Amino acid sequence: MIAQLKGSLAAKHPDHVVMDVHGVGYRVFISLATYNELPTVGEACLLYTVTHVREDAFLLYGFHSESQRKVFNLLTSVNGIGTKLALAALSSHTPEALLTALSREDLTLLCTIPGVGKKTAQRMAMELKDKLGALPMAAPTTAIGAATMAANPAGLREEVASALLNLGYKPPQVDAALAKLFSAGEITDISVALKGALKLLAPA
């Protein structure tokens, strides 16, 4: 099992990165929260990873902090919660907010995760409530060289839309949010665009 990767950031996108470790490129799937903490391409980077082995694929999931990885593992232990949904949860909320919601059985917050309805939220709270006390939460340890990369304005809207669709938001929701976001003024940074879009998509 690969527990962490330390090397240079060869490429980054809202849903995955390529890490160059001694000349070997590893494709690693990430949350938007981790994306927002990444350094610029070419700089040193550390990701805490989870390895998933399937019959047809060897998949890596990376996180900028230990707490993100712990909550990812916790969420994927729930029956019916896959890696995509766990990444969506970590893209929408901090690990601390998710743990608080689970411990308090806050279904309202859990239902704001893309793809999570009331029944899924109830199952998450029921299956995980007893496990929370055994989950130590260390102080956040972030990826090496954290920085924000300015995106290419020409492809910014398309990249943000792709990231939101991958999280489970519906095309009409994404189109409406991005139309409102970009009509408010010029945005040239993808991190700013993603945060703004997620805020607009969050239930009032």
UniProtKB/Swiss-Prot annotation:
Q: Where is this region: Domain II?
A: 65-143
Organism name:
Magnetococcus marinus (strain ATCC BAA-1437 / JCM 17883 / MC-1)
Free-text comment on this protein's domains from its UniProt entry = Has three domains with a flexible linker between the domains II and III and assumes an 'L' shape. Domain III is highly mobile and contacts RuvB.
The UniProt annotation puts the region (Flexible linker) at 144-154
Q: Does the keyword Ribosomal protein apply?
A: no
Enumerate the InterPro entries for this protein.
DNA_helicase_Holl-junc_RuvA_I, Hlx-hairpin-Hlx_DNA-bd_motif, NA-bd_OB-fold, RuvA, RuvA_2-like, RuvA_C, RuvA_C_sf
Q: What is this protein called?
A: Holliday junction branch migration complex subunit RuvA
GO CC aspect terms: cytoplasm; Holliday junction helicase complex; Holliday junction resolvase complex
Q: Which UniProt keywords apply?
A: Cytoplasm, DNA damage, DNA recombination, DNA repair, DNA-binding
Q: Which family does it belong to?
A: Belongs to the RuvA family.
Q: Where is this region: Domain III?
A: 154-204
- Locations listed in the record: Cytoplasm
Its subunit composition reads: Homotetramer. Forms an RuvA(8)-RuvB(12)-Holliday junction (HJ) complex. HJ DNA is sandwiched between 2 RuvA tetramers; dsDNA enters through RuvA and exits via RuvB. An RuvB hexamer assembles on each DNA strand where it exits the tetramer. Each RuvB hexamer is contacted by two RuvA subunits (via domain III) on 2 adjacent RuvB subunits; this complex drives branch migration. In the full resolvosome a probable DNA-RuvA(4)-RuvB(12)-RuvC(2) complex forms which resolves the HJ.
Query: NCBIfam families, alphabetically?
Result: ruvA (TIGR00084)
> Which portions of the sequence form the region Domain I?
1-64
Question: Which SUPFAM superfamilies does the record match to this protein?
Answer: DNA helicase RuvA subunit, C-terminal domain (SSF46929), Nucleic acid-binding proteins (SSF50249), RuvA domain 2-like (SSF47781)
Name one molecular function that GO assigns to this entry: four-way junction helicase activity
Main localization, broad class: cytoplasm
Asked whether the UniProt record includes DNA damage among its keywords, one would answer yes
- Domain of life according to the entry: Bacteria
